[in-house]
């Protein structure tokens, strides 16, 4: 009976592991700083108390949480001889990954819907995207994330693990773990693709259709409004591609390639949460202005103190 799993990690080279430790330590620091900066800015600046920025702040919290499930252990494991995780710890990682990942999908869809209403039906925006609607969206996001993660965990919790325990990655995820089970997992592989893969692909297609409709609507707007809307949409579409691109290949692609899987796993858990705050702050004038106001307020408070 397997009681622990051994991660093979990203590399066997000690020199490369030292470099990767420094690189990902800086990256994770950037993830924490960037996403917390967005949350603090949105909460503290009344100019950003709108549905779009409410959803953005929640997206930043989920990005930070999603990265924190895997990145800290990956970083500490670079200096470990045996990169080990307990069986229960592995199940917890699977649960949290799909909990935050499922919730993020819903929030990205909600952000697409928010932009659709704001641009295509502006007169109804305040009625549809009211405070209660935003709270309801978050409740649905967490609820779907929970149901999705429980369904994923149900696939793995009763599987017999009696022999191989080496996971060729730096964290536990269902497609990799079920391959170590002492039973035929073909049907289970199909169920995982049907669950995570179909959910990912359908969500991605829905978002692409929504943003296509929005882009077609923008063409008929005045130049000043269309340029601002296009800037915001570019940020949204970039984030959607960064999130769903790796997900489609990890969960929906039936012919996994080990080296590509590791790269996509790093991209999904580290690079995307790092880039999202940069994209939203660099492409959004309101966010940049609010951050400057926050810095001035902080400097003023320090001088006063």
Swiss-Prot record:
PROSITE patterns: G_PROTEIN_RECEP_F1_1, G_PROTEIN_RECEP_F1_2. Its main location: membrane. One of its GO terms (molecular function) is G protein-coupled receptor activity. Disulfide bonds join 90-182. One of its GO terms (cellular component) is plasma membrane. This is Olfactory receptor 4F4. Residues 43-50, 114-132, 213-228, 283-305 are cytoplasmic. Residues 1-18, 73-93, 152-188, 252-262 are extracellular. Pfam families: 7tm_4. Keywords: Cell membrane, Disulfide bond, G-protein coupled receptor, Membrane, Olfaction, Receptor, Sensory transduction, Transducer, Transmembrane, Transmembrane helix. InterPro entries: GPCR_Rhodpsn, GPCR_Rhodpsn_7TM, Olfact_rcpt, Olfactory_Receptors. It is found in: Cell membrane. The keyword Transmembrane helix applies. CDD domains: 7tmA_OR4-like. It is a multi-pass membrane protein. Odorant receptor. It comes from Homo sapiens. The chain crosses the membrane at residues 19-42, 51-72, 94-113, 133-151, 189-212, 229-251, 263-282. Belongs to the G-protein coupled receptor 1 family. The keyword RNA-binding does not apply. Gene3D superfamilies: Rhodopsin 7-helix transmembrane proteins.
């Amino acid at each position: 009976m397997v009681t622990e799993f051994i991660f093979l990690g990203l590399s066997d080279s000690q020199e490369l592991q030292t470099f990767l430790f420094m690189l990902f330590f800086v990256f994770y620091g950037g993830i924490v700083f960037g996403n917390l900066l967005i949350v603090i800015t949105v909460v503290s600046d009344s100019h950003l108390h709108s549905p779009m920025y409410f959803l953005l702040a929640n997206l930043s919290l989920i990005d930070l949480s999603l990265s924190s499930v895997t990145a800290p252990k990956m970083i500490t494991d670079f200096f470990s001889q045996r990169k080990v995780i307990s069986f229960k710890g592995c199940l917890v990682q699977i649960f949290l990954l799909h909990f935050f990942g499922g919730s993020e999908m819903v929030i990205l869809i909600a952000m697409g819907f928010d932009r659709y209403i704001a641009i295509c039906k502006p007169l109804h925006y305040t009625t549809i995207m009211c405070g209660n609607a935003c709270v309801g969206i978050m409740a649905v996001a967490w609820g779907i994330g929970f149901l999705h993660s429980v369904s994923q965990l149900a696939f793995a919790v009763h599987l017999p693990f009696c022999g191989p325990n080496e996971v060729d990655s730096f964290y536990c995820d269902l497609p990799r773990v079920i391959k170590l089970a002492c039973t035929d997992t073909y049907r289970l592989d199909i169920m995982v693709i049907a669950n995570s893969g179909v959910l990912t692909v359908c969500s991605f297609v829905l978002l692409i259709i929504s943003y296509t409709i929005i882009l077609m609507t923008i063409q008929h707007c005045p130049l000043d409004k269309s340029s601002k809307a296009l800037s915001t949409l570019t940020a949204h579409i970039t984030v959607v591609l960064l999130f769903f691109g790796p997900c489609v290949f990890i969960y929906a692609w039936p012919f996994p390639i080990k080296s590509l899987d590791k790269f996509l796993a790093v991209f999904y858990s580290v690079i995307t949460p790092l880039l999202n705050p940069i994209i939203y702050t660099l492409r959004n004038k309101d966010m940049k202005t609010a951050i400057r106001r926050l810095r001035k307020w902080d400097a003023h408070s320090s001088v006063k103190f």
